[in-house]
Amino acid sequence: MSTVYLVIPCYNEEAVLPETVKRLTDKLQRMIDSGRADENSRFLLVDDGSKDKTWELITGFCRENVYCSGLKLAHNRGHQNALLAGLLAAKDKADCAISLDADLQDDIEVLDQFVDKFHEGCDVVYGVRNKRDTDSFFKRSTARGFYKVMHILGVDVVYDHADYRLMSRRALDALSEYHEVNLFLRGIVPLIGYRSDYVFYDRHERFAGESKYPLKKMISFALDGITSFSVKPLKLISNLGILISCLSVLGLLYALISYFTGNAVAGWTAIVCSIWLLGGIQLLCIGVLGGYIGKIYSEVKARPRYRIEEFLP
């Protein structure tokens, strides 16, 4: 039997936590009874600086529930950092750790399959959605676009995989060697290597509360993923500059020919359009460069990714 830790990041999840803890306790007990997990297995609730009663609930669960552990971050650091904090806290206590969301959308009934594949020798097991029926048309379309862009840019990500995954202790040790401040675990974990496999599941509707990933956060998360793992946007800027330079030379030749043949067109329409076009392209390129420079600025400061305020083992 193996010691299995379930790592659950929480941010303002007071509406779902009681039901989440109830279901996780029942599932973990069944895993222990079936021999997939031992009595030292736990589910670790990580409070990412919540503003509601999330931590108050977690402390109560830890007093009453032998399988519950809690970790509180000193302030809100985002889902990825909260998840990393939980995984690294579980690293020396568990044979493997499985990360999942607190909103009960990840199907916990497939946890058995994760552990079975771990016992078969896999160090990383990815949870992959069978379909995206619970998402809106807009979210489905943007998600597909995101994964396609990532693959075009050469980033190794698993299609339709979020953060529902199992990692062995060896994989967690490898993960601890990555010190990026700008975290994108979906891109980092495949870089670890080791033997991996997939578990396919159906994602449920959110049990209660609201999504903690509105459109603004999703766009920011996608941009972080792109700029953290690929320099192709910078190369595209260079290629775009070469293309525009070539077009400018052709335009200049056309203008000179028109001037000397007496066919010059009066008016400023073409000039104004060119100025607006080139100005827009320049601003876009500056924005891309600024995004990369901002990441460099964050990384070189080497500030802590999170700070643990309290840990309830």
Q: What kind of feature is each model-predicted range?
A:
Residues 26, 30, 60, 64, ...:
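Conserved amphipathic alpha-helical interaction elements at protein-protein interfaces in regulatory
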Residues 67-75, 79-89, 96, 108-185, ...:
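Acceptor/aglycone-binding surface of glycosyltransferases and processive sugar-polymer synthases
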Residues 9, 73-75, 165, 238, ...:
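Short conserved micro-motifs on helix faces and helix-strand junctions that flank
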Residues 184-313:
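Hydrophobic helical membrane-anchoring modules
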Residues 9, 27, 61, 73, ...:
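Amphipathic alpha-helical segments that mediate coupling or scaffolding at interfaces
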Residues 1-135:
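Structured catalytic core of nucleotide-sugar glycosyltransferases
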